[in-house]
């Protein structure tokens, strides 16, 4: 079982090679879950949008993974926080 599907899903000016790797990982995650790749990508974007309203994230260290066992599939997000933003 692959323990980490997504490594640094954010693009950080590393070019199209990193983009291709990110998309491939989404496809692999799709193959192992009932969610399609575009839904997974949209979930990732929306999660980050909401969390970013409250904290500044270390975008170079973000990790998303999907773990599946016989009973469930879990989306796991590792979102390192640089600092907490002031009240909105």
Swiss-Prot record:
Coiled coil: none annotated. Its main location: plastid. It holds the Pfam family MinE. Keywords: Cell cycle, Cell division, Chloroplast, Plastid. One of its GO terms (biological process) is regulation of division septum assembly. InterPro entries: MinE, MinE_sf. It is found in: Plastid, Chloroplast. One of its GO terms (cellular component) is chloroplast. Prevents the cell division inhibition by proteins minC and minD at internal division sites while permitting inhibition at polar sites. Belongs to the MinE family. This is Putative cell division topological specificity factor. It comes from Guillardia theta (Cryptophyte). The gene is minE.
């Amino acid at each position: 079982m692959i323990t980490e599907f997504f490594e640094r899903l954010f693009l950080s000016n590393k070019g199209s090679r990193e983009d291709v790797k990110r998309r491939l990982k989404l496809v692999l995650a799709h193959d192992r879950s009932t969610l399609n790749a575009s839904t997974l990508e949209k979930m990732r974007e929306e999660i980050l949008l909401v969390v970013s309203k409250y904290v500044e994230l270390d975008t170079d260290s973000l990790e998303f993974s999907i773990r599946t066992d016989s009973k469930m599939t879990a989306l796991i997000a590792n979102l390192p926080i640089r600092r907490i933003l002031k009240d909105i």
